[in-house]
């Protein structure tokens, strides 16, 4: 008698990683957002050049296109910005812009797409920050050195209201860094 051994699919592995990251970030994405994030991660692994493009030019170029071509380009810009802001925040530093720059561009791309074709792109724009927080937690799951640095976390929290960045600031500020702990504890977290 032969036994059947089922290998987990890459979709199942990504799903498990996203679920673990949600728990680590103390964020619960709804099923639609979770599925979209898994599919975006799967698509990225097949096209790693996605994050090396100049997204601002692609975003501007999308205005010159129409129909499906424009929709695909706006989706790609939103997805790339999500991945850069969540998985590769160090790329923002290399490009001499804040992580919030990619957040704002990604949210704008998704919102424009929603304005054109509706669907769930409005939800992607609205929940960009929680998805980014999950991706930050994903980076940190196996390597705590993957935290964004304290000043970048402070800037990200201040610009976007990222709860994960705020936790990073709180954790870092308790270690004697120069950010005033009483100011952080009293900060408005309702972004």
Each model region followed by its residue ranges:
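Polar/charged low-complexity regulatory segments
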Residues: 1-191
């Amino acid at each position: 008698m032969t036994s059947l051994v089922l290998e987990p699919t890459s979709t199942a592995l990504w799903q498990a990683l996203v679920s673990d990251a949600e728990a680590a970030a103390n964020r619960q994405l709804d099923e639609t957002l979770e599925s979209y994030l898994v599919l975006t991660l799967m698509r990225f692994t097949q096209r790693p050049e996605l994050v090396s493009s100049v997204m601002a030019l692609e975003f501007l170029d999308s205005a010159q296109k129409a129909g499906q071509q424009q929709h695909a380009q706006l989706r790609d810009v939103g997805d790339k910005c999500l991945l850069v802001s969540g998985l590769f925040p160090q790329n923002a530093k290399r490009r001499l812009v804040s992580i919030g720059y990619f957040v704002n561009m990604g949210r704008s791309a998704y919102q424009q797409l929603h304005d054109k074709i509706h669907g769930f792109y409005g939800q992607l724009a609205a929940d960009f920050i929680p998805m980014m927080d999950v991706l930050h937690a994903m980076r940190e799951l196996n390597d705590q050195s993957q935290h964004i640095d304290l000043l970048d976390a402070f800037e990200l929290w201040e610009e976007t209201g990222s709860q994960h960045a705020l936790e990073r600031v709180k954790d870092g500020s308790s270690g004697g860094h120069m950010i005033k702990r009483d100011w952080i504890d009293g900060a408005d977290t309702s972004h």
